[in-house]
């Protein structure tokens, strides 16, 4: 065959029963297809996104999660404490990721697929809040500070026309 289709199924956090069940149902339905349809799915049946950037928090930025009043001024960036709820949801421009608590922070480090810094394309500081500049879908957004420091904060996806 000239083609070998492959997919990645994102189903939530490891070990969550709903994610495991969702993956199982998807694979079962694929395995029981009598044939691969020759027509594309209906537009209403498919949301197509692609990863456009990796978001990192610079090493010099002291960050935490929750209300800045609890930090005693020790943080540069106070991220919203339930940001992981935005995972795999398309969010509008202007969505706050947290409060900027020092002048050291003007945006996240955001790198596109070519390794170019595109932070100013996706984020801005407005009224003391670090906000999205455009409609995006965060993926793999984590609240684990060790993962954020060792790997990344999240990825950003944008809708592909279909």
How should these model regions be labeled?
Residues 1-162:
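Structured catalytic-domain cores with a bias toward divalent-metal coordination
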């Amino acid at each position: 065959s000239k083609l070998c289709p492959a997919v990645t199924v994102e189903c939530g956090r490891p070990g969550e029963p709903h994610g495991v069940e969702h993956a199982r149902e998807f694979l079962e339905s694929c395995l029981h297809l009598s044939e691969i349809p020759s027509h594309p799915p209906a537009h209403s049946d498919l949301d197509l996104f692609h990863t456009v950037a990796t978001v990192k928090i610079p090493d010099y930025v002291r960050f935490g999660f929750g209300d800045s009043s609890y930090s005693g001024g020790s943080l540069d960036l106070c991220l919203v404490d339930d940001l992981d709820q935005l995972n795999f949801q398309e969010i509008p421009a202007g969505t706050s990721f947290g409060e900027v608590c020092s002048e050291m922070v003007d945006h996240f480090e955001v790198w596109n697929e070519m390794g170019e810094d595109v932070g100013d394309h996706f984020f801005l500081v407005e009224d003391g809040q670090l906000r999205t500049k455009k409609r995006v879908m965060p993926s793999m957004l984590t609240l684990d500070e060790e993962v954020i420091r060792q790997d990344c904060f999240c990825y950003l996806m944008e809708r592909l026309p279909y």
